[in-house]
Amino acid sequence: MHKILTGGLLALLLLLGGVLPAAALDIHIDNSQALGGSLALRYLRTDGVWVTKGWVNFGPHSKQTVTLETWEPVFYLHVEVGGGASVELPGEKHRFWVVRDVFELEGDARPARGQQADFIKVEVRGDDPRFTLRF
């Protein structure tokens, strides 16, 4: 009886593993430009808290991957290049707080030295949660 229950639970876990969303979302940055830049990201962490964090720096003519620990296929993205010029990206705009230094803000925290920036909403579809940002 114990073996049947264990086997049944294992089969159920394997079945659910195929339906549950991944706990990580990869953002691939492919910058072919002569200027480097920075990203700020807002996403729902696996513990259920929205977090806005920055800055993920990328160099000129570089490629790198950022992994977000999240169950959600939706995140928000803000991009700056060349020392702070915002990049206008197409998409649904939302305003969130950022700080010039490296930061991580939970929920709707409003930092003392912060400013609001335009983020675009990105929704990733498919079984393999990844997004590629090309410049």
Feature annotation, model-predicted:
Residues 1-9:
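Bacterial N-terminal signal peptides that target proteins for export
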Residues 8, 78-79:
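Short, well-ordered beta-strand segments in beta-rich or mixed alpha/beta enzyme
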Residues 17-19:
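N-terminal signal peptide c-region/cleavage motif recognized by signal peptidases
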Residues 21-47, 51-60, 65-67, 79-135:
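Intrinsically disordered, low-complexity segments enriched in small/polar residues
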Residues 72-78:
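Short, Lys/Arg- and Gly-enriched loop/turn segments at beta-strand edges
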